[in-house]
């Protein structure tokens, strides 16, 4: 959800994911709102991608986790398109791409099917690579055809800022 507080926009991506898990499914509406704000409001984009706040990483992480959870959902095409365009817009920022080097919380990694056994850690870049690979390779091509260009462009935009992906990201 997005709220304005004392003139500053704060992104609360975690609440989107929590509501998704509760079955209220506002994910598509949240993705549409994020896409519209990121495309039409430069101040919002600057705030979300600001290295001081790093608000884009939780937003992207929540969207990637929901995309991964909806791999088999044939009705999630609209959500996947909105989420992929949000990721594409965020990837235009070098600060956001650099922030993807941060270590992903184990709970987030588990939602993407990434192993955390033995203290193994993954970066947000690893999670993004894993989810994009799963979406583009494990789903029916006719469903994911509109997502190929934005998702591959997202990876291409962000990759130069990554400090070496982990085992999952480099596989």
Where are the regions a protein language model picked out?
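Eukaryotic scaffolding regions of large macromolecular assemblies
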Residues: 59-65, 76-171
């Amino acid at each position: 959800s997005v709220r304005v507080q004392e003139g500053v926009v704060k992104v609360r991506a975690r609440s989107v994911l929590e509501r998704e898990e509760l079955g209220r499914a506002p994910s598509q509406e949240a993705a549409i709102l994020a896409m519209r704000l990121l495309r039409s409001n430069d101040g919002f984009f600057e705030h979300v991608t600001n290295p001081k706040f790093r608000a884009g990483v939780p937003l992207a992480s929540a969207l990637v986790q929901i995309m991964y959870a909806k791999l088999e959902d044939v009705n999630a095409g609209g959500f996947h398109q909105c989420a992929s365009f949000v990721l594409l817009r965020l990837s235009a920022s070098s600060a956001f791409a650099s922030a993807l080097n941060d270590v992903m919380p184990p709970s987030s990694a588990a939602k993407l099917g990434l192993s955390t056994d033995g203290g193994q850690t993954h970066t947000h870049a690893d999670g993004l690579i894993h989810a994009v690979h799963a979406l583009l390779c494990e789903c029916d091509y006719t469903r994911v055809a509109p997502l190929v260009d934005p998702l591959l462009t997202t990876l291409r935009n962000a990759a130069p800022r990554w400090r070496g992906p982990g085992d999952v990201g480099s596989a």
